[in-house]
């Protein structure tokens, strides 16, 4: 049994290089919610050195809100914005001897794409026109998974061990109670359940089936790096290999 571990990098948390020793896929901010050319180049260089799969982490152009404010934009504008960010990271990756293997939208763009077909299709179209061999990381069971597969792209279904889930499989919004899980032992147990049993318990108590292909490790917070290391160690102790998503076999 295998799983991919991913983390969002280039966002100024300060632990990017160390996180790259723990994950198999890196989602690199493309400058619209955080990061910039220097951070992008640094993260790409480290990822290439450590053999970590490189992914783009595009967002709405909203640095003031860290890309977490929902926006109602025309599909063409979303398409162009995603394509623009992919182009920027791709140029840096090529110069450093790497390439973009996947795309994971950030923040509000990610959440809206999970439920809004217009936004999902705009993202998928941009990825397809950029390079149809690039995979899309999307919330498990979401509309973005469907849109990507309908367009002939590889969709990698993502789960979050430290986020609360609703009974419909969506994430509890960050501003609501139960959105974030703080008990490390609970999160570790939840991680193993997601991978082994392919399900997660919602806040309501119901069990939600999901296809866990990649797990997001959060790198922000004073104890995030140590906890990410605990998760990696727990998976390996349970006999679960950690490999980039394009090599995952569940």
UniProtKB/Swiss-Prot annotation:
One of its GO terms (biological process) is carbohydrate metabolic process. It comes from Paraburkholderia phymatum (strain DSM 17167 / CIP 108236 / LMG 21445 / STM815) (Burkholderia phymatum). Forms a complex composed of PxpA, PxpB and PxpC. Its EC number is 3.5.2.9. Catalyzes the cleavage of 5-oxoproline to form L-glutamate coupled to the hydrolysis of ATP to ADP and inorganic phosphate. Pfam families: LamB_YcsF. Keywords: ATP-binding, Hydrolase, Nucleotide-binding. It is an enzyme of class 3 (hydrolase). The keyword Magnesium does not apply. It catalyses: 5-oxo-L-proline + ATP + 2 H2O = L-glutamate + ADP + phosphate + H(+). GO terms for molecular function: 5-oxoprolinase (ATP-hydrolyzing) activity; ATP binding. This is 5-oxoprolinase subunit A. Belongs to the LamB/PxpA family.
């Amino acid at each position: 049994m295998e799983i991919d571990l991913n983390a969002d990098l280039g966002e100024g948390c300060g632990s990017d290089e160390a996180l790259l020793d723990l994950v198999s896929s890196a989602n690199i901010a493309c400058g619209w919610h955080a990061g910039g050319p220097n951070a992008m180049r640094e993260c790409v260089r480290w990822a290439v050195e450590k053999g970590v799969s490189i992914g783009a982490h595009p967002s709405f152009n909203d640095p003031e809100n860290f890309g977490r404010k929902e926006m109602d934009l025309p599909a063409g504008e979303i398409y162009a914005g995603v394509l623009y960010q992919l182009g920027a990271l791709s140029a840096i990756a090529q110069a450093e001897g790497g390439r973009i293997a996947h795309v994971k939208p950030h923040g509000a763009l990610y959440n809206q794409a999970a439920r809004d077909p217009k936004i999902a299709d705009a993202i998928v179209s941009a990825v397809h026109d950029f390079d149809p061999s690039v995979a899309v990381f999307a919330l498990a069971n979401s509309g973005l998974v469907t849109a990507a597969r309908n367009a002939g792209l590889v969709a990698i279904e993502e789960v979050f061990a430290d986020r609360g889930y609703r009974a419909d499989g969506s994430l509890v919004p960050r501003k609501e109670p139960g959105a974030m899980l703080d008990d490390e032992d609970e999160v570790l147990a939840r991680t193993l359940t997601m991978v082994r049993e392919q399900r997660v318990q919602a806040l309501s108590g119901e069990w939600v089936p999901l296809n866990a292909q990649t797990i997001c490790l959060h790198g922000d917070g004073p104890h995030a790096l140590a906890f990410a290391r605990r998760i990696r160690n727990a998976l390996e102790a349970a006999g679960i290999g950690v490999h980039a998503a394009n090599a995952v076999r569940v």
